[in-house]
């Protein structure tokens, strides 16, 4: 097993999960802040805003899970290691 391939796999896995979590994390914070602001402006629309927020948070979290899957594949099911 080539140590350079192993090192590149570890770095790639770290980048996959790190960069895969940074964007959705920022997006989730922004979405939650805007939802709180929307509920403060229109308290009667709380249910609709909350439902839309939860759906959008689930879609954003899926991106992080995809990054985790790529990282796990690079660590444990690496196609480059024979």
From Swiss-Prot:
The chain crosses the membrane at residues 3-23, 57-77. Belongs to the ATPase C chain family. It is found in: Plastid, Chloroplast thylakoid membrane. PANTHER family: ATP SYNTHASE LIPID-BINDING PROTEIN, MITOCHONDRIAL (PTHR10031), ATPASE PROTEIN 9 (PTHR10031:SF0). It is a multi-pass membrane protein. Its main location: plastid. Gene3D superfamilies: F1F0 ATP synthase subunit C (1.20.20.10). This is ATP synthase subunit c, chloroplastic. Pfam families: ATP-synt_C. F(1)F(0) ATP synthase produces ATP from ADP in the presence of a proton or sodium gradient. F-type ATPases consist of two structural domains, F(1) containing the extramembraneous catalytic core and F(0) containing the membrane proton channel, linked together by a central stalk and a peripheral stalk. During catalysis, ATP synthesis in the catalytic domain of F(1) is coupled via a rotary mechanism of the central stalk subunits to proton translocation. Key component of the F(0) channel; it plays a direct role in translocation across the membrane. A homomeric c-ring of between 10-14 subunits forms the central stalk rotor element with the F(1) delta and epsilon subunits. It comes from Ostreococcus tauri. CDD domains: ATP-synt_Fo_c_ATPH. The keyword Membrane applies. The record marks 61 as: Reversibly protonated during proton transport. GO terms for molecular function: lipid binding; proton-transporting ATP synthase activity, rotational mechanism. Keywords: ATP synthesis, CF(0), Chloroplast, Hydrogen ion transport, Ion transport, Lipid-binding, Membrane, Plastid, Thylakoid, Transmembrane, Transmembrane helix, Transport. InterPro entries: ATP_synth_csu_bac/chlpt, ATP_synth_F0_csu, ATP_synth_F0_csu_DDCD_BS, ATP_synth_F0_csu_sf, ATPase_proteolipid_c-like_dom, F/V-ATP_Csub_sf. F-type ATPases have 2 components, F(1) - the catalytic core - and F(0) - the membrane proton channel. F(1) has five subunits: alpha(3), beta(3), gamma(1), delta(1), epsilon(1). F(0) has four main subunits: a(1), b(1), b'(1) and c(10-14). The alpha and beta chains form an alternating ring which encloses part of the gamma chain. F(1) is attached to F(0) by a central stalk formed by the gamma and epsilon chains, while a peripheral stalk is formed by the delta, b and b' chains. In plastids the F-type ATPase is also known as CF(1)CF(0). GO terms for cellular component: chloroplast thylakoid membrane; proton-transporting ATP synthase complex; proton-transporting two-sector ATPase complex, proton-transporting domain.
